[in-house]
C-alpha cells in the first residue's frame, strides 16, 4: 500500500530513492532545517542480524550524516526504549549505537524518541505482534511510576509528538520516552 498517495499538500515533493544510498537522496536535503528519521526494519527477529544492522544502524547513521552535510540543524530520530550502545541485548545495542553516531555529528538539536511498543493500525509482523497489539492496551494501566516508560503509543500519536516537539524551541541532545510523549501531546512539556 502507498501511504503517501493521498497527500496533496503542494509543499510536498515525492522522490523514490534507495534509502541505503545517500547519493540518491542527499541533494534533496539541502535547505531544510529539520529531518525526521523513522528508518528501521521493525521486528528484528524477522531479519538476519547483518541486514538489521545495515538498515537500522548504518542506513540511519548515513542519513543523519547526509543531513548534517547539507546543513540540517535539527535531527529527530525514532529509536527504542532502553537504547544503550553497551547493552548485551542486540536490538537495544544497535539503537544505542545509532544514537551515539548521531550525537557525534554535532547537530544543534538531536532528539531521540524512545517508544516501547508501537501500536500499529495493522499487524505487520505476525503472531508475536498480534499478541502484543492485543495485550498492551490491557497492560498499559498497570505500568506506573518508573514502568510507565514501557507503555505503548500509537504510531499516529508518536508522529504527532515528533512534529510538535520539532516545532518547539530546544537545543542539544534530548531523550523522550512515554512520559515526555504525553507531555508534548498535551502541550505541557518536553
Tell me the role of every PLM-derived stretch.
Residues 3, 70, 85-188:
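Oxidoreductase cofactor-interface core, primarily capturing Rossmann-like NAD(P)-dependent enzymes
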Residues 38-39, 75-81, 113-115:
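SDR active-site strand-loop-helix element
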Residues 51-98:
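Hydrophobic, well-structured mid-protein blocks that either form specific transmembrane helices
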Amino acid at each position: 500500500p502507498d501511504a503517501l498517495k493521498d497527500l496533496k499538500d503542494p509543499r510536498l515533493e515525492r522522490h523514490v530513492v534507495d534509502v541505503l544510498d545517500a547519493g540518491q537522496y542527499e541533494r534533496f536535503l539541502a535547505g531544510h532545517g529539520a529531518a525526521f528519521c523513522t528508518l528501521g526494519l521493525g521486528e528484528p527477529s524477522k531479519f538476519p542480524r547483518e541486514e538489521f544492522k545495515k538498515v537500522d544502524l548504518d542506513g540511519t547513521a548515513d542519513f543523519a550524516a547526509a543531513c548534517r552535510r547539507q546543513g540540517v540543524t535539527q535531527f529527530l530520530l525514532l529509536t527504542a526504549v532502553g537504547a544503550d550502545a553497551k547493552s548485551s541485548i542486540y536490538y537495544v545495542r544497535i539503537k544505542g549505537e545509532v544514537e551515539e553516531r548521531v550525537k557525534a555529528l554535532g547537530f544543534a538539536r538531536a532528539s531521540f524518541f524512545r517508544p516501547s511498543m508501537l501500536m500499529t493500525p495493522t499487524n505487520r509482523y505476525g503472531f508475536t505482534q498480534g499478541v502484543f497489539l492485543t495485550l498492551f492496551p490491557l497492560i498499559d494501566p498497570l505500568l506506573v511510576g518508573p514502568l510507565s516508560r514501557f507503555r505503548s503509543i500509537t504510531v499516529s500519536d508518536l508522529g504527532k509528538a515528533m512534529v510538535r516537539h520539532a516545532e518547539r524551541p530546544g537545543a542539544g541532545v534530548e531523550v523522550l520516552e512515554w512520559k515526555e510523549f504525553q507531555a508534548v501531546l498535551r502541550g505541557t512539556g518536553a
